[in-house]
Regions:
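N-terminal beta-strand motif that seeds the catalytic metal site of vicinal oxygen chelate
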Residues: 1-21, 76, 134-185, 232, ...
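Short beta-strand/turn micro-motifs at beta-sheet edges
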Residues: 1-2, 60-66, 160-163, 217-223
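Core segments of cupin and vicinal oxygen chelate
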Residues: 5, 14-61, 175-218
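Ordered, small/hydrophobic-rich secondary-structure cores
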Residues: 6-16, 25-28, 34-115, 233, ...
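Vicinal oxygen chelate
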Residues: 17-21, 76-123, 178-182, 233-282, ...
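Short beta->alpha transition motifs characteristic of CBS
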Residues: 57-58, 110, 129-136, 217-220, ...
């Protein structure tokens, strides 16, 4: 069945920050991510594909206002191909804990799929380090999906040589908790077009033309508020498609239990809106080129103008996009 929304790609997940400079250092020098600043208070990071982490600085006061006991269930996951590498990463995390302001290094857990452990960083975000075969969770899905835009910057499937403390091979997943897996699966498949695979009664993987997946888990968490700053995002090809998507969500608000549907706005260089679902999870649909944030990594470093290209004389990324395909081409359209 054709989904109600035509969303091309799992673009990003959000993380909140206290200090962007310290977080850049942690992401780049410890975790081994490809990271750049998009403004004095924001960053974007990736590893192994173009599904990105978007970091936004709220500061200590802003973070203190939000009671978010669910953050552990909104973690990002990074893969090593062997258990020995995970065990070594666990030891290295203790060795460098103070240098990178890591709040906690969790116990090393030996599970059926291999060892794993959790890190709690200075910003209160959680990171899972785990053993996973090359390709991440793709082995659980039938057949291939269209990863053209997910891997447009990775033609040989390899990442750049890492000089970081940890050297994971892939950001394989972001985690999202739900209340009722059956109801949530119907929403994700029928509305968003996410390809879902159940791993058990209370666990499900979802992908959308992506290498990275969403790892859905059913929980009994009582407090589920303050999730807008930790939303998951999709990109579409133009403002008019953003508007059309919002109308479809409004039309299906009662059917699928959408709680809050925000008005569209222009922020961080794009036009889009956020909304929350029946599980109080937050989502974003925004106008961005095919492949999402990957064009930012084509700019040769941190963005000199907030959320805009470093190419001289170009003040809007739309000028560097093919108007027909919405592909980033890197030269100004005239």
């Amino acid at each position: 069945m054709k989904p109600l929304l035509e969303l091309p790609f799992l673009s990003h997940g959000h993380a909140t920050l206290k200090d962007v400079e310290e977080t850049v250092r942690f992401y780049r020098e410890f975790l081994g991510l490809d990271v750049l600043k998009t403004s004095p208070r924001t960053l974007v990071a990736r590893l192994g594909s173009n599904t990105a982490i978007v970091g936004v600085t709220l500061g200590e006061k802003g973070l203190a206002k939000a009671d978010r006991p669910w953050l552990r269930n909104a973690h990002f996951g990074f893969d090593f191909s062997t258990g020995d590498e995970v065990r070594e990463a666990h030891e290295l995390s203790f060795s460098h804990q103070d240098n990178f302001n890591i709040q906690n290094v969790g116990d090393l857990l030996e599970g059926d799929e291999g060892p794993s452990f959790m890190l709690l960083d200075q910003d209160g975000n959680y990171w899972q380090i785990l053993e996973n075969p090359i390709g991440g969770y793709s082995r659980f899905f039938d057949g291939e999906c269209d990863t053209k835009h997910a891997l447009v910057s990775f033609p040989d499937g390899k990442i750049q040589s890492q000089t970081s403390i940890l050297k994971p091979q892939l950001m394989s997943h972001m985690t999202c908790e739900v209340i009722d897996m059956d109801k949530s699966q119907a929403l994700y498949e029928n509305m968003f077009g996410i390809e879902c695979v159940r791993l058990g009664p209370k666990r499900m993987l979802g992908r959308l033309n992506s290498v990275a997946v969403i790892d859905f888990i059913e929980t009994d968490t009582e407090i589920r508020e303050h999730k807008m700053h930790n939303h998951i995002g999709f990109d579409v090809a133009g403002p008019e498609i953003v508007d059309a998507a919002r109308e479809i969500i409004i039309e299906n608000q009662e059917r699928y239990g959408f709680e809050v549907i925000h008005k569209t706005s222009g922020s961080h260089g794009s036009y889009g809106f956020t909304f929350s679902d029946l599980d109080n999870n937050a989502w974003q649909i925004e106008d961005y080129p095919r492949g999402g944030y990957y064009w930012m990594f084509e700019q040769g470093g941190d963005l000199q103008n907030k959320f805009q290209p470093n190419i001289g004389g170009v003040d809007d990324w739309h000028k560097l996009v093919d108007p027909v395909t919405y592909e980033y081409v890197g030269v100004e359209n005239r």
